[in-house]
């Protein structure tokens, strides 16, 4: 049995993430989905809580025939111990999936096999673009699984993003508008 690990902020979980997991599902028996920056929420860059992102992912992946564990991973300010931190929070895994150069480097240094999954329609299937569309009232629902749009509606996520779009919690330009 092979268990994989795929990390992202998933702000929000979108169709590109879903397609990556669909590909990963052909290679592993189980998947640990790491919810990165788990302690951050209610800001322009990280509007959703870890719990809300767990709901998005769990509901969006319900039709997959894949055992999935969604695990919140808080940020560390010490990259040298990050892989140990991830391992301490997750079920054991044999292979990590990422396209982030730092994540790849850290897992390689820890002797963890890393596979780089294809990225899909990155010009629009990107969290910042989806959050910008939410802030501006443009179409974003077509870029996320229906289950994610339902979760965003349930938590008034668009209203939250529009509220924090002009300035972040520290009064700085959020970059969304």
Swiss-Prot record:
Q: What is this protein called?
A: Nicotinamide-nucleotide adenylyltransferase
| Pathway annotation from the record | Cofactor biosynthesis; NAD(+) biosynthesis; NAD(+) from nicotinamide D-ribonucleotide: step 1/1
NCBIfam families the record matches: arch_NMN_Atrans, cyt_tran_rel, PRK01153.1
Q: Which InterPro entries match?
A: Cyt_trans-like, NMN_Atrans_arc, Rossmann-like_a/b/a_fold
- Please indicate which superkingdom the organism of origin belongs to: Archaea
Gene Ontology MF terms in the entry: ATP binding; nicotinamide-nucleotide adenylyltransferase activity
Q: Which residues cross the membrane?
A: none
Q: Pfam family example for this protein?
A: CTP_transf_like
Question: What family is this?
Answer: Belongs to the archaeal NMN adenylyltransferase family.
Any one GO CC term of the record: cytoplasm
In terms of SUPFAM superfamilies, this protein maps to: Nucleotidylyl transferase
Location of this chain's protein in the cell: Cytoplasm
GO BP term, pick one = NAD biosynthetic process
Q: Which UniProt keywords apply?
A: ATP-binding, Cytoplasm, NAD, Nucleotide-binding, Nucleotidyltransferase, Pyridine nucleotide biosynthesis, Transferase
Reactions catalysed according to its record: beta-nicotinamide D-ribonucleotide + ATP + H(+) = diphosphate + NAD(+)
EC annotation from Swiss-Prot or TrEMBL: 2.7.7.1
First-level EC class: transferase
